[in-house]
């Protein structure tokens, strides 16, 4: 059935929805048994050539990767390398943290440097990897060292991951990362059934096997993040934050669906939780203030204004002003906070125009 869905390239959106709903009629039964480490990021079943603490650090890194928590994932992959320098997949994981495809961010130099480090270990003392793990490394090489521009290399990477998933049909991680890669190719249209249905079908099959897989839930929300498909995203949206509550991004992601459906109070709740989780992480790890989740902070502003909660919106502007002052006093990089302050102020005044709230948000700059 899934093969026939993927093969049909010209089907109307209504028919696509019916086909997907047929997939949703079968709830998942399988559960993973791999530990997620100290952070509550969900569980996965990902056999590796490493064991012990190196394996635990690696699995936590992959879980963070599934929630686009790239700095945290990088820390865990580096710890896995330190514990087991011959563990090839630990280098694969760190290379993965330098590509943020759905955010259009890619650090090619950093990725190539990690692969060069892996090659140096291979040449000096050899690597511990299986043929399947070698397939992961070969795939990521196409993204960083392949021919052509980044769009061409994304196409090649997506094809390589799809081959890996087909060669190892029991590897849920290969299938999940393959689906993400397909969404990342140039021209992928979230409102086009021809693009959405094959990827969604692949993810729905994974969901049937493991309905609490954090990557599957995350990527389902992304693939359904458009007006025609948003109702299908409610299922993963209701679960993802519960599965990976340590991740600010996991707490934020359900609001993509809630926003499409104009469920603004739920957008508020999601992004309050998401921003606070990022504050906890930033303070616990002693990182600069600009590394907080200001994306969720911005969505919180949008939701407050949509609900005419002008006092709350003004409170965000004042909080941002206070954070800027603190960061400047510490001599920290301000990141996008100054531009966000200007955007918030303009956004507030535009939304409040013609109301008693106009001009009422006094901020000393």
Residue ranges and their predicted role:
Residues 42-56, 125-133, 285-288, 332-340:
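TPR-adjacent "capping" and linker segments in tetratricopeptide-repeat scaffold/adaptor proteins
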Residues 53, 86-88, 171-174, 212-214, ...:
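Residue-level recognition of tetratricopeptide repeat
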Residues 82, 119-120, 162, 166, ...:
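Amphipathic alpha-helical segments of tetratricopeptide repeats
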